[in-house]
Amino acid sequence: MEGNKMLTYIKEVLENLPTDWLNLTTHRLDIYDEKAAKTQFLEQFEILCKTHNSDPSALQSLPTAYDYIRLGHPLSCVLEWTLANLNQLNPENVISFSSQTAAILAILRTHLLNGKNTQIVYTGALPDAFDTETLKQVYGYHFELKQVENTAAVTKFDGSTIYISQQKELWTVEQSSNIDFYVQTNPALGSVLLVNGHQNKGYISDIQHVRRRETIAMTPVNCLKTLSVLTNTSSPTAHTILEANKTQV
């Protein structure tokens, strides 16, 4: 689907957002098929998109696990699907995290087990939680670290290259054949990982496993914030819920 039409549809989805997409994180057993938990929601969502159906009842009826601790949730699925389309990637190649560093650690662990060289390049500053010495001395991860100005400065590497950038707009990616993984971080929102190239497809299940077992997807509120900025849509609902949660805590 052409980018502008897709974003117009996403904007309409946000305007008709089911309240459960923000509030409900337990199983909807009446519409949940565990065997298709990772694919069923997006398959049905794409049908609605193609027919430009953003009716609240249609969105509410989409089958999903509604469990961001394990498999992702409706808004993380929509965010990942949107970013994948904007960057001409398969939706499974885009994975969101509440953490800024979990995706990086998942890749480093896989490389340690496989004995693969790793180059981490970054623009600006690394995430505060990224402790180079701890990763090397305690976890035994091996990697080269290099600061660059942009993706054009990333050179070919005998191994795998992770590109980290901190920015407000998590969807902005300048693709390069010299980069295997893009990690877009935002201290207030989390991070988004983009897996580049068919040769890296095998990493996806391992990274999803880490998110499922050790962390969570970007939260519903933060996904809504990101999608709202992307589509120039206000999201008072997200702000209201966030402030209410802070009060309860």
Predicted features, each with a name:
Residues E2-L105, R109-V249:
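Conserved N-terminal alpha-helix of the aminotransferase class I/II PLP-enzyme fold
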